Each structure stands twice: as C-alpha cells, then as structure tokens.
Amino acid sequence: MITVDFGNRIRELRTKTGLSQEKFALKIGMDRTYYASVESGRRNISLINIEKIADGLGVSLNELFAFNKENDND
C-alpha cells in the first residue's frame, strides 16, 4: 500500500537526520500526532505537506518517492 511505503520511506530518511518524530514535526510546522500517523501509513497526506516533509529532510520529491515498489503488481 502506497501510504505504508511512503511512511516507511519518510521514517528511513528522518532517522538518518537523527531527529525524533516530535522534533521533526516541530521543524516542519506539523502536529506530531498527524506526522506520526502519516509515518505509520495510517493517514493520507496532502501535496503541501509532502513538500514540507521533503524540504525538512533536505531531499527532492523524486528522492522522497524513491521507495521499492517491486512487490506491487496491480
């Protein structure tokens, strides 16, 4: 599921920064519980918030969406 794949990707990138969910959410101006639900794949996210996450992580949108989709055959 794309929301889970996206959540796993942003978790991977966030942990590389050394920031907790709370500190990262604060950095990008997002509520921690909302961010946590996106990272866990339980919530859809708007394009505006995707851009905030990419900017906060210092990556391009292409890099943000560079997760492995080989198991998705539908």
Predicted regions mapped to residue ranges:
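Recognition helix of helix-turn-helix/homeodomain-like DNA-binding domains
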Residues: M30-R43
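Short basic helix-loop element that most often maps to the first helix and adjoining turn
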Residues: N8-K27
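Short, conserved catalytic or interaction motifs in soluble domains
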Residues: S40, V59, K69
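Conserved hydrophobic/aromatic packing and binding residues within compact polymer-binding modules
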Residues: I10, F24-A25, Y35-V38, L64
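Helix-turn-helix DNA-binding elements, focusing on the entry/boundary residues of the two helices
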Residues: I10, Q21, R32, L47-I50
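Short, charged recognition helix plus adjacent turn
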Residues: E63-D74
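DNA major-groove recognition helix of helix-turn-helix/homeodomain DNA-binding modules
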Residues: N49-E63
